[in-house]
Structures are given as C-alpha cells and as structure tokens.
Amino acid sequence: MRTPRETDPGSVTVLHAVQPGDGGVARVVVDLVRAQLAAGLRVAVACPPGTALSTAVRAEGADTHDWRAGRDPGPGLVRETRELGRLIRTIRPSLVHAHSAKAGLCARLAVRGRVPTVYQPHAWSFEAVEGTTAALARRWERFGARWADRVLCVSEAERRTGEAAGIRADWAVVHNGVDIARFASDGPPGGSVPTVVCVGRLCRQKGQDVLLAAWPAVLADVPDARLVLVGDGPDAERLRAAAGPSVRFTGAVDDTVPWYRAADVVVLPSRWEGMALAPLEAMAAGRPVVVSDVDGARESLPPDHRTPCLVPPEDPAALAAALGRLLGRPELRHRLGREAHEHVLSRFDVRRTGAAVADVYRELAGARDAEHREPIAQ
C-alpha cells in the first residue's frame, strides 16, 4: 500500500489525454481542468483539434495540445499512440489521466507504467459492442489494467461491471458532478405546452430510438405534448426519419441550460451508462428525470424516485407510461423536481468530484516521489 505524501500543487503537472472531444466526457474534463487550475496544478490536455473540448480547455487556460486521434481503434492506432507518446515526453507530466476507451488504449500503450496513470473508462467499451469485438475489448481491458495505477470509475455499478469482466485493478470510484449554480432555475417552466427533453449524443447507447417508439403512446395521453432531442450524433438522420411533427431536433448546442429549464420532464432511455451527466444536470435544474434501469443511470436517482422515474431499458410501453404519468400530474412533477435538486446538491456537486479526484492525484504523485520510474522510450 502506497502512503500518500504532501505534494505542492504547483509541482504537479497533470496531462489529460482525451478522445472523444465532445459530449459528456468533454464536459467532465472541462470541469476537472477548471478545478485543477484553480487549485494551482499545472494542467495540459491532449485532445483532437477543433473540438468543443479543445476550445473550452484552452479558454480555461490549460496548455492544450492537438492529438489527432479517431474515436475508434483502427489503422491509425500505431500513429496515434506514437504521437501521444511524443507529447508525453515533451510535457513530462507528473501524472497522465486518460479518458474513455480510445485514450485509455493509446495512453497505456505509450506509457506502459512509466508515469503514474489514471484510466477513466466513462462506461466500458465492451458494453457498446457484441461478439468477438466485445471479447477482444474485455481481453484488452484485463491486460491493460496492469498499466493503470488507478482505474477511476464514475459509479459503483461501473466498477462492478469491470470486476465481473475479469478486470483486476486498483479501483477508485468518484461520481460525476455538476455545477449546481449554473443549472439551477427559479422554478417550474412557464410554458403552456407539456415538454419532454432528451439531452444526449444521438446514438444507440442513449436510446432515442426507444423514446421515439414510445412517443405515440405519450401523445395518446397528452395530445399537445412536445419532444425535444438535444444533441447530434451518428443516428441523427435515421432518428429524424422516424420522428413525427411533435418532435424537434436542435442539433448540437453550446449551452444545454435553456433546454433543461424549458422541460417539464427530462428523459434519458439509455441502453448502458457509466454515469450520465444529463440526469444530474436536469436534477440540478429542478426537473424530474425518467431514466432506464441500467447501471450508472439508476445510481444517479434519489432512492425514492425509482418507482415513478425508473423504467426497464428498451421498453417503449413502460417509458410512455412513466412520461404520461408525470406530464399529467404537475404537482408530482414539481415535488420530484424539488427533491431531485436537493439530492444533486448533497451528492453530486462538481466541487466534491474535483476534490475527490485531487485526492487520487495526490496519492499517486506522492508515490511517484518515492519510487524510480524508467523514462519513456523515444
């Protein structure tokens, strides 16, 4: 067991290696970077250029480096790994924090234990695929865990999923957090049209296809209801083709706050999650959320909200019933929204998240002072 040591924050350089450069992962990284800079750490970020993340962390004052990495493994993997290795040799970080599967793959191959490394899956890659591809992903995660000083999970459920897959790691669990003040609202929405909002990447994971399948049954109960899908992604064209006139697509937006505030109910019918930000952001805005009964989403809810707000995954009928019930009962919506806000305030404040991650860093940075590590090969 390594013993934490007091470390001057200004002597610690953290390199965040990140792919993807958008969506919830990017928002988590921006919040961490902001907190770490405020704490006096030196922070560098390697991420794809021209992304929302690259723009945001540069604006925060982080040392930002272009890392031209695609989202999935492919023919460019060797080049991407070598490029990240060159950046690491140039930056000489005290610690590397790799976010999501692709950055976790490249960073661990580049470093191979020679710099303290935190790997944060943000939901396991093997949950997104099936068959041989899933088996290969599990096999890599089992092997690659030896090159992570910590595997940092965003929920206990994510950790359990990793353990069940045979990954033997030095685990840490730190829940995602949100900026409560940014998302807080003055009360229920003032509009007269019942509005359901779904914020998330338009992809199979987030389950917008299930939501569109449920929507006709919602309209049967609440004919004037409107559905807003906030975000963009690979399934956008297919989802638009399946949507009726009561469904609006916003595309990618820079600020989701107005959409949460416009919502009567926020929904995220995911097939799997690590711990999604959208439900936390919605609850911070005082909105009730309906989520799928999957790991990571379930863990975000107040325990007594599970009956009205938790539905089986890929079950349009159950999803429609939950949405219709909340749209038809404003007093229930308002009570759940108030309770949701208090729940997030007490458990998911981003300041709590930043402090917990800093504790992990301090332990690993102190351990690095106590041992010799070989330099990264040229």
Outline where the language-model segments fall.
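A short, well-ordered alpha-helix in the C-terminal region of glycosyltransferases
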Residues: 325, 332-347, 353-358
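A short, active-site helix/loop in glycosyltransferases that binds the activated sugar's phosphate group
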Residues: 147-172, 178-182
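A conserved mid-protein helix/loop that constitutes part of the nucleotide-sugar donor-binding site
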Residues: 23-34, 106, 194, 198-217, ...
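Aromatic "clamp/platform" in nucleotide-sugar-dependent glycosyltransferases that forms part
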Residues: 252, 271
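N-terminal strand-loop element at the rim of the active site
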Residues: 15-80, 161, 173
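Short hydrophobic beta-strand element within catalytic cores of glycosyltransferases
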Residues: 288-292
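Acidic anion/phosphate-binding donor-loop and adjacent secondary structure
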Residues: 72-79, 163, 175-193
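Conserved acidic donor-binding segment of nucleotide-sugar-dependent glycosyltransferases
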Residues: 303-317, 325-330
